[in-house]
Each structure stands twice: as C-alpha cells, then as structure tokens.
Curated annotation (Swiss-Prot):
Gene: gtfB
Function (record text): Glucosyltransferase that transfers glucose to the 4-OH-Phegly(4) residue of vancomycin aglycone (AGV) to produce devancoaminyl-vancomycin (DVV) in the biosynthesis of glycopeptide antibiotic chloroeremomycin, a member of the vancomycin group of antibiotics.
Protein name: Vancomycin aglycone glucosyltransferase
Keywords assigned by UniProt, alphabetized: Antibiotic biosynthesis, Glycosyltransferase, Transferase
Pathway: Antibiotic biosynthesis; vancomycin biosynthesis
C-alpha cells in the first residue's frame, strides 16, 4: 500500500505530516510527500520521498513588503492550480491521500483524489476550525457581523466567503477534468469526517455534528543532541528564556522589547532566528542566537518560552513542561494562547505587539514557581502517540474501505 501526504504550508503544516509519514512507514506502507521545496532536507533526514510542489513556503516571510490583497489573490490562484497540475502524477497508484493546512490547497487535492477514485482525509491542527453549530468559527480577518447572527449562520457566512474566494477557480479546474461543481467548500475540503491532530488536554475537541476523530498531535520524537556551543551556554548559568516566532516575521521592535523585558527579570535569552532571520540587538554575553535545533530537548532546559502561538511550538513546549507566553499573530494562534492561559501553564498576551510593560507583566506570571509547577503537571498528561494513532486509523480505514471515512 502506498499513501500520499500533501501540504503547501509552512513548517507548522509540514512537520506533523513528517511524523505521520514515519509512523505510516513503520506499519509497512510506502509513503511519499508533496510539499514545498523547502522541505527537501527535512524529508531526506527521515528517508521519506519528497515531491516538490509549489513555490518556497518562505517566500512571503522574506518579502520586503507585506502581502497585498492582490498578492493573496494571486497566491490563492496558484495554490489551487498547482494541486491540479502536480498532485495527479504523485497520487497515481496511491491508496489514500492525507492533507493538512490551507483550504485553498486542500480543495484542489481532494478534487484530484476524487478524479482518481482515491480516499481522501483532512486533518486540522486546531479544534476551533472544525465546523460546529455549538461554537462560533474563528475570525477570517475581515469585517464581520458575527455578534448579531446565530452560530450556524456564522459558519455558513464563512463558508460562503470561502466559496466567493475559491469557488470559481476550483470549479473551473474541476470542469476541465470532467468533475461536477462544488458549492459547500468547507465540507468538501475538510470532509464530514475530519481528524484533529491536536492533544485532547491542550486542545480538546468540542461538540460537533461531524464524525471528527481526535488523534493527538503528530510530533516525531527528536533525538538530536544540542550543539556544544548551545549546551555550553545553557550550562553557564540559570535557565534562560526562549524567544522565537517560528516561520513568521516578528512585530516591529518585538525582539528588542522582549530582550529588554527578559533582562529586567534577570534572565538570559535564547533567540531563535526563525524564517525571518531575526538578529540580536547587541552582542551581550547573556544572549545566544540559534538556528535549527532540537526544541524538544531545548524547551526542557529553559525557564519560559515566548512565541507566536503556533500549534507545533505550543505542543512541544507543553510536552516539555515549559511555561509559555504567547504573542498570537494570526490564524489558530489566539486559540492556543487562550488555552495556555486557561490551563494555567502560561500567559496569553493581549494582542500581537508586545511592549516592555506588557511582557514584563507576562514574565512576572510565567516565571513563578506556581506556573512552573502547573506546566510540569500538564506535561505529564500530553499524549505522545498521536501520529501512531493516526497512522493506524488511516491504514485501517483504507483496508476496510468504510464509506464513512473514504472520499
């Protein structure tokens, strides 16, 4: 049996699929992965065949200017078209297709799977995105009247907005390969049987009328040692505070403001350069900049983790028992910020842009013995087998060819 995994997103979208790929392979199936060209080295590390699809996922971060509305429209057009152009050859002979991340790409992937008669599966990294009549949808970043309409109407409004953005492009490509038009974009891309690749303690699945399954987060154990230089820095003093924004750019002056606040608490700093290639504001001996490292090990040796609130970073920090301060920038990050605060394992910063005072106050909470104790306690409840659970679920579903889980 051969399985195709596909995504066009950033590290936060690709890394869970890397974990799933390894666990599917462990069960004896062949696996290949369609992903941006940036993923070549990572997939080579774990021995998963890589089919480069689409442009570099780093391109939006490395732009000199912010994305405009026209840029977003062009990206959407290309994301949908790329799936129709590239996925068919990669999916040929596969028994199933699994995708995560951008809806614009997912609807293209499912269309190809439909044409080839291949079962299709979609996984969320955040339960708040699972459509439900019992809680409101996450904001789409556009003017909304959601406070004046009921919850099902809010989801339908967002679904119609998705159709307005994607429907014409999608159905044009579908018509070209002999497929009927799609109107319900959410159900088509997400299916009525989605998976939730998030931890049930950190991000519990809420009531939904869909046949959703929560597997736990898809995280591959990382056995890599820390570099001698980083290990020496850690050994040279008390646990530092980690600062990083992953594959996002940092808000203006956020690095300087954060380091000033951390220093004011008498703590050292580890700055993750990330995709934006962040730099330290000075050459102080109390700061250390890092590139690619084993965060699973590193987070177990820091006093706190200040980050953007991506699902992957939040899960890894929670599993390591590290207190967190989340500066949510977009998408599912406000949700994870709220959950960290609700669990008592850290602080949800009010808004994406920190000030010295706001971060100082957040650190005053995150660095307390009480927060550390709570983070340690919650760490013991976080599942470590999510990718293995999903791999078994996938292969069992395909083998049984159950209509409730196949396209």
């Amino acid at each position: 049996m051969r399985v195709l995994l596909a995504t066009c997103g950033s590290r936060g979208d690709t890394e869970p699929l890397v974990a799933l790929a390894v666990r599917v392979r462990d069960l004896g199936a062949d696996v290949r992965m369609c992903a941006p060209p940036d993923c070549a080295e990572r997939l080579a590390e774990v021995g998963v065949p890589h089919v480069p699809v689409g442009p570099s996922a780093r391109a939006p971060i490395q732009r000199a200017k912010p994305l405009t509305a026209e840029d977003v429209r062009r990206f959407t057009t290309e994301a949908i078209a790329t799936q129709f152009d590239e996925i068919p050859a990669a999916a040929e002979g596969c028994a199933a297709v699994v995708t995560t991340g951008l809806l614009a790409a997912a609807i293209g992937v499912r269309s190809v799977a439909e044409k080839l008669g291949i079962p299709y599966f979609y996984a969320f990294h955040c339960p708040s995105y699972v459509p439900s009549p019992y809680y409101p949808p996450p904001p789409l970043g556009e003017p909304s009247t959601q406070d004046t309409i009921d919850i099902p109407a809010q989801w339908e409004r967002n679904n119609q907005s998705a159709y307005q953005r994607y429907g014409g492009l999608l159905n044009s490509h579908r018509d070209a390969i002999g497929l009927p038009p799609v109107e319900d974009i959410f159900t088509f891309g997400y299916t009525d049987h989605p998976w939730v690749a998030a931890d049930p303690v950190l991000a519990p699945l809420q009531p939904t009328d869909l046949d959703a399954v929560q597997t736990g987060a898809w995280i591959l154990p990382d056995e890599r040692p820390l570099s001698p230089e980083l290990a020496a820095f850690l050994d040279a003093g008390p646990p530092p505070v980690y600062l990083g924004f992953g594959s996002l750019g940092a808000p203006a002056d956020a690095v300087r403001v954060a380091i000033d606040a951390i220093r004011a608490h008498g703590r050292r700093v580890i700055l993750s350069r990330g995709w934006a290639d962040l730099v330290l504001p000075d050459d102080g001996a109390d700061c250390f900049a890092i590139g690619e490292v084993n965060h699973q090990v590193l987070f177990g040796r820091v006093a706190a983790v200040i980050h953007h609130g991506g699902a992957g970073t939040t899960h890894v920090a929670a599993r390591a028992g590290a207190p967190q301060i989340l500066l949510p920038q977009m998408a599912d990050q406000p949700y994870y910020a709220g959950r960290v605060a609700e669990l008592g394992v850290g602080v949800a910063h009010d808004g994406p842009i920190p000030t010295f005072d706001s971060l100082s106050a957040a650190l005053a909470t995150a660095l307390t013995p009480e927060t550390h104790a709570r983070a340690t306690a919650v760490a013991g409840t976080i599942r470590t087998d999510g990718a293995a659970v999903a791999a078994r679920l996938l292969l069992d579903a395909v083998s049984r060819e159950k209509p409730t889980v196949s396209a």
